[in-house]
C-alpha cells in the first residue's frame, strides 16, 4: 500500500498538495501544527478539509513552544501584518524562524511510525516570499539529515516547488478542485477564508495567480503539465 503524509495548514498550497496526493496514494494522512499562530481558524479549516477530502487520519500537533521562540507577525498580535509590497527586499516579518525545520522533522517522525513512504509539503521557491525555509536547497538538505538520523529514506516531495501561483491554480483545476481551493481554504495572513483580505502579501500572490490562470487557462495548464509531467487531459 502506498502511504503518504501531507504537511497540512488548510491553505491553498497544502490543500492542492492534499488533493493531488489523494489521487496518487492509497492512504493519505495529514499533519497540522498548532504553534499559537495568530489566526487559529486555520486549524479548524484544516480539520474540515482533511475530513471532507478523505484523509484517513488528521493529526494536530501542539508545538506552541515555537511561539515563545519565534517572533513574527504570525505569532504576535502586536506586530502588524504588512500590506503587499511588491518591491520589498529581505525577509518579511511574516517569516516564522525554524517553522519548516520543525514541521518537516516532526512529520518525518509521524511518517516513520505509520510506515509512510513520502512526506508532501507545499513549499515553493518560485513564489517563496523571501522565506529561506521554502527553498529546494533547504528541503534537500533536511531530507538528507533526517534520512541519516532515522536510517530510513522517507521521500520529501515538493510538488509545487517550481510552479508559480497561476500554475498552482492550474494544478488544483487539473484535479477538479479549483472552486474548493478558492472558497474553502485559508491562506490570508489576516485570517480571512476564501479570497481573503486582499491586502496582505499572501492574498496578493494568490489573487494575481488566479487572475493569470483565468486569463489563459489553456496556456498555463499546458506549462503546469509540462513541469509536473501530468498527462494532457
Swiss-Prot record:
GO BP, one annotated term: queuosine biosynthetic process
EC code(s) of this entry: 6.3.4.20
Highest taxon above the source species: Bacteria
Binding site for ATP: 8-18
Pathway participation: Purine metabolism; 7-cyano-7-deazaguanine biosynthesis
Annotated keywords: ATP-binding, Ligase, Metal-binding, Nucleotide-binding, Queuosine biosynthesis, Zinc
Cofactor binding, note field: Binds 1 zinc ion per subunit.
Reaction equations catalysed: 7-carboxy-7-deazaguanine + NH4(+) + ATP = 7-cyano-7-deazaguanine + ADP + phosphate + H2O + H(+)
Signal peptide location: none
Enzyme class, first EC level, given as a word: ligase
Cofactor(s) required, per the database record: Zn(2+)
A GO molecular-function annotation: zinc ion binding
Binding site for Zn(2+): 188, 197, 200, 203
Free-text function comment from the UniProt entry: Catalyzes the ATP-dependent conversion of 7-carboxy-7-deazaguanine (CDG) to 7-cyano-7-deazaguanine (preQ(0)).
Family: Belongs to the QueC family.
Full protein name: 7-cyano-7-deazaguanine synthase
Species for this entry: Klebsiella pneumoniae subsp. pneumoniae (strain ATCC 700721 / MGH 78578)
Amino acid at each position: 500500500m502506498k502511504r503518504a503524509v501531507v504537511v497540512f495548514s488548510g491553505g491553498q498550497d497544502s490543500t492542492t498538495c492534499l488533493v493531488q496526493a489523494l489521487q496518487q496514494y492509497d492512504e493519505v494522512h495529514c499533519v497540522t501544527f498548532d504553534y499559537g499562530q495568530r489566526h487559529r481558524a486555520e486549524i479548524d479549516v484544516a480539520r474540515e478539509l482533511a475530513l471532507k477530502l478523505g484523509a484517513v487520519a488528521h493529526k494536530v500537533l501542539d508545538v506552541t513552544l515555537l511561539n515563545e521562540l519565534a517572533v513574527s507577525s504570525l505569532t504576535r498580535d502586536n506586530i502588524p501584518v504588512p500590506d503587499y509590497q511588491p518591491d520589498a527586499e529581505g525577509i518579511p516579518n511574516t517569516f516564522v524562524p525554524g517553522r519548516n525545520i520543525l514541521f518537516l522533522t516532526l512529520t518525518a517522525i509521524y511518517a516513520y511510525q505509520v510506515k509512510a513512504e513520502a512526506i508532501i509539503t507545499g513549499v515553493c521557491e518560485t513564489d517563496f516570499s523571501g522565506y529561506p525555509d521554502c527553498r529546494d536547497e533547504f528541503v534537500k538538505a533536511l531530507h538528507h539529515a533526517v534520512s541519516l538520523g532515522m536510517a530510513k529514506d522517507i521521500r520529501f516531495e515538493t510538488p509545487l516547488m517550481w510552479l508559480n501561483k497561476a500554475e498552482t491554480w492550474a494544478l488544483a483545476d487539473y484535479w477538479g478542485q479549483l472552486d474548493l481551493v478558492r472558497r474553502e481554504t485559508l491562506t490570508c495572513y489576516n485570517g480571512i477564508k476564501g479570497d481573503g483580505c486582499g491586502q496582505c502579501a499572501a492574498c496578493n500572490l494568490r489573487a494575481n495567480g488566479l487572475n493569470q490562470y483565468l486569463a489563459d487557462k489553456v496556456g498555463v495548464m499546458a506549462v503546469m503539465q509540462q513541469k509536473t509531467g501530468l498527462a494532457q487531459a
